[in-house]
Amino acid sequence: MTKKTIQASCRKNKLYLTPHLNDVLYLHYSGYNAIDGLDEYVGLKCLWLECNAISNISGLDHQSQLRCLYLHNNLIKKIENLQHCKQLDTLNLSHNHIAKIENCGSDILPVLNTLNISHNYLKSIESLAELRKCDFVSVLDISHNRIEDIAIVKVLADMKGLRVLTLVGNPVVNDIPSYRKTLILECKSLTYLDSRPVFDKDRACAEAWKRGGYEEERKEHQRWKKEEQRKMRRSINATLRLRHRGDGEPELLKTSSDEEEEEKEGSAAGRGDFEELEYQSNDVAWKEMEALFNQHTKGDTQQAQKLAEERKASTNSVDYITGSDSNSDPTLVTDCDSCVRNSSRACSSRSDTSDSEDMFDKIVPKKHRKLASSMRPEVSLSDSSSSSSETEDEAGSILDSKLDRQNTITEFIDEYKRFFHSVDLRDPKCVLKNRHKIVRPQTAKSQRTEPIVYEGVLKAMEQNSNGAKIEQARQERFEANERSLAKEAVLERLMKGHAEVDMNIEQQMISIGGKQHNFNEYRLEVFRQDQEKLQNLIDRVTAQKEKYNAHIDSIHDQLANIMEDYGQISEKLRKVDDMIQNIGDEVVVHQEKERDGLEVIQELEPITIAEQIVENMTKEQVPDEVEANDKASDATIDPVDQLSSDESAIDLGELNQHVDAQVEVGPSDPKDATTSKPIPEEFGSDPVYRKFIDIQYEIDKLTEDQIFTALSEAARELQEEELETKLVHDAIDEYWSTDLEDFRRNLNLDAHPIVQRFKRFIECQGTDTDDTDSEAHVRRLENAYHRYERRLSNHLFDEYLMLSRKASIATTTGGESSATELELVELDGGHVLRASTSRRATAWDLKETVEDPVEELEELNEEEDPALKEAGDFKHDELEDEESKPEEKTLKSAEVLGMQEPLADVQGDH
């Protein structure tokens, strides 16, 4: 890193060429091994040095304003030389070789906020003790290190400002019980752990787990879940209220069952008092109705005034219950209310029955609290005062007004229906929740009427109006909700999910390719097909695995054989090295003796030395030649002995070269024990030892380069031989897996010509047989069977040898295959009754010729009739051919050759 390279980097990244004007510098991916040349860059705030070969931190003495330093993917082993960077906020040292955190406490880096030391070599608690001094570090990444000590939890707990922690990839993560809960409890300010944030719910559940275990944690989780659902519901209801502002109260979301239970428990006492008071007020209203319909037709003014006062008192009690007094808020009047009022004006009369109570409260009895007089609009003080004066004037004409209006009840029933269009009858709490907003339609005091007085009206109204009309109103309200598609219904369906959808698709018929199929049958059929495909794949993989394992085993066996051969070769080479070392020591001793006794050596003539060496060697070789001649005369000559006898016959030219080499080196003193070491008897008669002596003389004449070249060529030849051996073994393996299997599969003994001929022979012999000569016939068949069996085995063996010609190389090179592994086609021997107790010929019994019959068969043949014997022999001779005696000729030829070779050797010696 030089000033020139730094300026080139600035030019490349379009930075300032004036050093102190740059606040950021990009020196990453540059191959630097040290930090240098930054003295003039005093205004740097961000320095990028990642992906280099920096081994230590240095050269930052003038970077007092540095805020961010990126040194990841380097070769740093120690944190040092950062005391001048007092304003450093972010330090990235990941993917380095740091084994200990040091020199980064608050005394050196007082404002350090983010520290990344992931993918390093931190292991013990001592290497992390410096973190206790990092008071202002809020983001710490120590992932993918080698931390194993569980005490790291206490170190992290001492970091009061820690907010974000990444600890994944360390062995200690698996050792900490309840890893996430433990760290949340220990690190009080933690907001992000590994790859997930830490919410208040997680911390509350962790604290509950600490208090009472998993059961307490489950309860805390349920409590948080309910609270979240409650907040969501409140938010949706608030949104619905804002949307329907001015249109009346919207249909809001219902609370869950558990919240309803809590609300019921909380409001049980108040609701009981309300029902009691409401019942009392309704009881007073019914008594009032009875008195009204049972009064005399003339109408008494005083009694009417008394009844009006009683009704006023009951009305005031009801207003007290419903909160509709003069001090309450003004009620909202909807469009439906205006419509009802207009209709009520059309059917109004000249007088009214009371000042603060309409006919709806008297006509409809108490069956639902929505039908009671609790939904009464407030009445101002001026209205109440004026109504009291009007009651006195109109009390006398009550009966006349009732008789004039015959259709008043029907009109009020219609008004009752229109009223229920604006009330949600499905919500039993509608009266309590909406008592200040949803109001029953009113009629003006001057337009109110009294019901017609006739017998049985109360009974008829109770039977007809109470149940049927309420049910009809509910049905109309339900149909209206379905037509309007209210927001509450849509949200309710979204909250409940697909409760009304028929999900039983297994019983439905589906159409595939234009045909109807049962879902269960189609699914089972597809499952069977997938299972068959999977099973076929498993079988293929298993077969491939078995084949691969067999191939690996064969390779291991071949390697074992090769290593065994190499061991034998190395042992022989070690012996050769020992012999060469002994010969070298003798040569050194010869040179020393040559310097000491130079005069004595000069007196000896070279011809004399050569003659002595030749004489000694000829003496040693005479017994070997005689022994070789004796072995050559034998018919069964051992190949190893022939090789020794051939090698013992040393060429005359090689002998002269050996003599010349002895002359150059000089003779050794036979009396000196150090110069002439006794040769072991096993090497004295070994021609290989003599050959190695000659090779040693040739090696001494070569230079080092020539020796190296020769060894290289030998190594290359060994590699080529090894490669050829491998190819041969591969070909053999292929043969065993293909050709031999084809041979066995295609082998059909019934169709073999020899077997066909044997069957025809049996048919011929079976046509002219009598009971008298049955034993002779059995013997003839037995003899023919032996001959045909031997002939068939010879044929099959010849075919097998033709197929196994590839494997002959492996048997000679010491490979995997051998003669014992050749699974020859063999006809197992058996025993037959009576004369067939002799062992039958097989493919391995080739040495057994036709001329060596079984003794029992010979005895039986001698007892036969001469005429039958001649006839049988004639038939056997017809069937006999040259193929039944293949080894007889080979043995005779081998004996002839064995007799000729010793004669040739003796003549050559002479």
From Swiss-Prot:
Compartments, as annotated in UniProt: Cell projection, Cilium
Gene Ontology annotations for the cellular component aspect, listed alphabetically: axoneme
One GO MF term attached to the UniProt entry: dynein complex binding
GO terms for biological process, alphabetical: axoneme assembly; cilium assembly
Biased segments, Polar residues type: 314-331
Pfam families for this protein: LRR_4 (PF12799)
Start and end residues of each stretch annotated as Disordered: 217-275, 297-332, 344-399, 620-642, 662-682, 855-910
PANTHER family linked to this entry: LEUCINE-RICH REPEAT-CONTAINING PROTEIN 46, PROTEIN PHOSPHATASE 1 REGULATORY SUBUNIT SDS22-RELATED
Family: Belongs to the DNAAF1 family.
Name of the protein in its database record: Dynein axonemal assembly factor 1 homolog
Organism: Anopheles gambiae (African malaria mosquito)
Taxonomic lineage of the native organism: Eukaryota, Metazoa, Ecdysozoa, Arthropoda, Hexapoda
